[in-house]
């Protein structure tokens, strides 16, 4: 059984409102990526500015615990925000809490740049406080954007639309490198300084304190630009009909968006809801969806260990690849410029294409195949880097850069995209946002393993440590490959068919007997 409003959404041709939804939701992910990854470009500058000790004879460096907090605290906030807003998205509505996440992102991006204090410790403490709440807002964007896009899209292009929203993360990473590169180039040209080797004191320009603040605050701009349009979006038809039980409002909203006439079918909706009223934490849910939830959570957890380790430790690996000079050969702002430039190049030629390959091929190859291919290829390239690390570092840095870039490509033309898409499709409407939040939060738990574990291990930039880290990540990706067998293909099917909400039984989403949709000839069974 399918409601007319749901069939209309599934069969709708691609229209302008689909494009606007992608842009509005996608700009949130642009901001998310920019805010999460721009800290990588300026963290070494923070060390030079606030933690320089002349007695060491080396440029200032953030202590391990401070570095882990500055780069990783936003991930803790993101995990918390995913669970909080994901739950509210199912209880209050996707739209009602969608604007709150954006307000948090704008306010905390600005406040991060205004971090204050009389000592280095207090400045870093204030920065960490605001970046936690920045991450909290970012976290809410994950389940809400994915759920909204999946519920707006038609079944033929749903995967491509959700992937396109997520692909804006790649644009955000590029801009994190580009903005830092442009600002540091301007400051470098305006405020000349010797290298650390020539003058340890004068090599750190005091104007760098303004520069890192500008880098962080610029993240507020794209989010602020989309707030009005985000508030103008109607609630999704699936939420209004299936969760609120208001078939008339759902039909009216979607008829206006699709520019067609849709019947309300309130009586049919009552039967639909009665067949799907089991709670999230129930035996019935785990019978029907437990395997998929375990699959989406474990694969995202393992993927983010590798993905965030790569992104957050780039600044430590770039010197080993020969992409930037040694720190004592540069002044503070020059180091930001070279780190940002290397990050921009890797993102432009490795990260960015992978996202859009997924957009273009997800409806042809399917989510499942792309995820398996991505995990496997990441494991292969990281294993090669780990085994041949000494040769690549000392004799063939260009091949090192190519292999490293390919790991980013197959992360994004692979599990980094599909782990975002699949939880938005596999689960029933009334728990879709929560299940996506649980999967995404598992991912951020993996990101924290990368940020606090792998990053801490590689921070000194020693060859042996980076080599071992690559081997660990290769094994992590291989485990992710096998965990991917717990999920299933969703392309070309309606959300209700995938989740079993329409009453049809499938091999992968069994419908327990007491939850069959009652016909007019038989009495309805008691619902558990």
Curated annotation (Swiss-Prot):
Expressed in which tissues: Expressed only in mycorrhizal roots, exclusively in cortical cells containing arbuscules, upon arbuscular mycorrhizal (AM) symbiosis with AM fungi (e.g. Gigaspora margarita and Funnelliformis mosseae). Also observed in root tips of non-mycorrhizal roots, in a phosphate (Pi) depended-manner, highest expression levels being observed in low Pi conditions.
Side of membrane Extracellular, spans: 40-68, 118-122, 180-208, 314-341, 393-401, 455-467
Annotated membrane topology: Multi-pass membrane protein
Native organism: Lotus japonicus
Gene encoding the protein: PT4
The protein's role, per its UniProt record: Low-affinity transporter for external inorganic phosphate (Pi) probably involved in the acquisition of phosphate released by arbuscular mycorrhizal (AM) fungi (e.g. Gigaspora margarita and Funnelliformis mosseae) during AM symbiosis; required for propper mycorrhizal arbuscule morphology. Acts as a Pi-sensing machinery at the root tip level, independently of AM fungi, involved in the regulation of early root branching and lateral roots formation.
Tree of life domain: Eukaryota
Main location: membrane
Induction cue: Induced in roots during development of arbuscular mycorrhiza (AM) upon colonization by AM fungus (e.g. Glomeromycota intraradices, Gigaspora margarita and Funnelliformis mosseae). Induced in root tips by low phosphate (Pi) levels.
Record family assignment: Belongs to the major facilitator superfamily. Phosphate:H(+) symporter (TC 2.A.1.9) family.
PROSITE patterns: MFS
Transmembrane segments: 19-39, 69-89, 97-117, 123-143, 159-179, 209-229, 293-313, 342-362, 372-392, 402-422, 434-454, 468-488
Name this protein carries in UniProt: Low affinity inorganic phosphate transporter 4
Disruption phenotype: Impaired phosphate (Pi) starvation induction of lateral roots formation. Abnormal structures of arbuscular mycorrhiza (AM) fungi (e.g. Gigaspora margarita and Funnelliformis mosseae) during AM symbiosis with swollen main arbuscule trunks and reduced branching. Lower symbiotic Pi transfer for AM fungi to the host plant.
Residue positions with a glycan: 456
Residue ranges, annotated region (Disordered): 496-528
BP GO annotations: arbuscular mycorrhizal association; cellular response to phosphate starvation; detection of phosphate ion; lateral root formation; phosphate ion transport; response to symbiotic fungus
A Gene Ontology term for the protein's cellular component: periarbuscular membrane
